[in-house]
């Protein structure tokens, strides 16, 4: 579990250090087990949720398209998509099935039957592009992140074609990241304590009421999500992110080839999260800024620029270079392998930014009064689509076709373009309205989401779910109180976490704010609260113990 090149921290060495590190690793694994058990308690393993089923339908369809016909590049066979819908994965289930929406999403037998129908239905491979370059039987993800298709395909290959495999794969990936973390930081007791805090934060989010089929607390009563939802799957980047943070916050140590291999593998998990959930790009921006500031501070303290490029130093430039190289390579690989139907149909293989930005203006209380008519009264996600449609219809007939599909629907690329134009038009003509939305209405909505998260923690769950975090924090306090070097590492790590909390909030602030999209922000807030509590309690214990020892020494001398 430990890299031979990683040096131990000061006095925290030998058997005591190894025992604490192994104990921390075991606690992190137990917390992951508690997470999975909680999902079983909430009946979220074999089922789908109202908030996430449409995204998962795209992912399942893409995975089955690749499994059956070997067609990748995030292409979806429309016939398989339709088969899944007819078999029950829809908001309008067949009355003969004897189940209504959303109860069909909780019927594990019906969902499995739908998967088997799509897997076994007798179909020839989809036809290639016609003379006009059109793919009649294939579609894309319609403006959603395409990495969910790769995730679902990997789950089906690993666990078979079933819904529970989508949950199990999450834990396989997070466990792999935890093992890699242990290999890279196993000799640092403080670093291992920090990863316990991250896993504890993930556990806390699973215990929130919005991670449920339907919230039941006083703070959240709407449809929720589960770990299969891309908005939660983005958290597979949490441990890889902590891995590279701690490389710069723990005391400097020597690196070897194994350390760089581990960093590259963590970066690969990070890149996978970015494909599944594009707003995770916040972590890339935060890391880049963190490295630049940390590097500047290192140079200011007297180290030469040449020493900063010493690849054997943990606080060296080659580490971020490796991480960024892996992330960039993954993005390029995904772009190269993208099916040509995306270009042909004007689809976008990621979450659409400008559509979300324009749609977020609806958070303003007076949006409907001021701008509702300009969108023909359309609301929510339909509003940007209607705005784009109106703009396209104002164009001369010969210019419209480039923005429309063969069935007359608006292309996703056109939706992004006209959403951007509409947003800047409102910003230019009514900057006060936009400023009020972003600096008054959105922060208020963010605060409401924070209350929904913390207010709904452990709602409807047995008491043991709340006792687990208390036991984990108590363990961390004892660990930190017993080891001054570990306490120092935790203090340095906690000091930079607020920066990551703020940056994690930026994608939500720019687009929409609700508990489901703010999960990354919640994770790092909980990490900071846990580390702050542990540091304060451990410091107090060490202070009292030191005072008692000094008193005893003084008494013996007297």
Please identify what each model-predicted range represents:
Residues 2, 14, 283-328:
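Perimembrane helix-loop-helix junctions
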């Amino acid at each position: 579990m430990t890299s031979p090149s990683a040096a131990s921290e000061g006095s925290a060495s030998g058997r005591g250090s190894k025992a604490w590190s192994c104990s921390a690793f075991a606690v992190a694994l137990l917390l992951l087990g508690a997470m999975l058990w909680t999902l079983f308690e909430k009946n979220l393993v074999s089922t789908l949720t109202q908030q996430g089923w449409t995204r998962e339908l795209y992912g399942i369809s893409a995975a089955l398209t690749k499994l059956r016909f070997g067609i990748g590049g995030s292409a979806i066979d429309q016939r398989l998509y339709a088969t899944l819908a007819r078999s029950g994965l829809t908001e309008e289930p067949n009355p003969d099935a004897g189940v209504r929406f959303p109860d069909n999403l909780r019927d594990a037998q019906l969902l499995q039957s739908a998967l088997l129908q799509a897997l076994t239905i007798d179909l020839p491979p989809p036809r290639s592009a016609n003379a006009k370059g059109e793919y009649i039987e294939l579609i894309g993800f319609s403006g959603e992140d395409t990495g969910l298709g790769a995730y679902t395909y990997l789950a089906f290959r690993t666990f078979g074609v079933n819904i529970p495999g989508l949950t199990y794969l999450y834990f396989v990936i997070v466990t792999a990241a935890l093992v890699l973390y242990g290999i890279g930081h196993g000799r640092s007791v403080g670093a291992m304590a920090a990863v316990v805090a991250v896993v504890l934060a993930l556990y806390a989010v699973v215990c929130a009421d919005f991670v449920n089929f339907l919230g039941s607390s006083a703070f959240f009563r709407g449809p929720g999500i589960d770990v299969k939802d891309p908005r939660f799957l983005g958290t597979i980047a949490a441990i890889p992110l902590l891995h590279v943070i701690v490389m710069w916050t723990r005391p400097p140590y020597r690196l070897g080839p194994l350390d760089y291999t581990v960093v590259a593998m963590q970066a690969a998990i990070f890149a996978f999260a970015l494909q599944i959930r594009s707003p995770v790009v916040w972590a890339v921006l935060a890391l880049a800024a963190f490295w630049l500031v940390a590097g500047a501070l290192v140079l200011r303290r007297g180290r030469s620029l040449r020493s900063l490029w010493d690849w054997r130093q943990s606080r060296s430039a080659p580490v971020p270079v490796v991480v960024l190289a892996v992330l960039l390579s993954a993005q390029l690989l995904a772009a190269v392998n993208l099916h040509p139907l995306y270009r042909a149909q004007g689809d976008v293989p990621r979450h659409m930014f400008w559509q979300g930005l324009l749609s977020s203006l609806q958070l303003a209380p007076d949006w409907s009064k001021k701008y509702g008519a300009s969108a023909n009264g359309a609301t929510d996600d339909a509003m940007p689509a209607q705005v784009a449609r109106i703009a396209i219809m104002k164009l001369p007939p010969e210019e419209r076709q480039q923005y429309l599909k063969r069935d007359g629907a608006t292309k996703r690329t056109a939706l992004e373009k006209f959403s951007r134009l509409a947003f800047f038009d409102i910003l230019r003509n009514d900057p006060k309205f936009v400023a009020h939305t972003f600096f008054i209405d959105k922060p208020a909505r963010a605060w409401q989401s924070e209350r929904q998260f913390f207010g709904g923690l452990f709602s409807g769950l047995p008491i043991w779910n709340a006792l687990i975090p208390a036991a984990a924090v108590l363990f961390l306090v004892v660990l930190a109180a017993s080891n001054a070097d570990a306490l120092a590492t935790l203090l340095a790590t906690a000091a930079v976490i607020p920066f990551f909390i703020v940056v994690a909030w930026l994608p939500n602030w720019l687009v929409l704010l609700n508990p489901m999209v703010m999960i990354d922000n919640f994770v790092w807030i909980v990490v900071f609260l846990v580390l702050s509590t542990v540091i304060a309690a451990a410091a107090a214990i060490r202070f009292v113990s030191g005072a008692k020892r000094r008193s005893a020494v003084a008494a013996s001398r007297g």
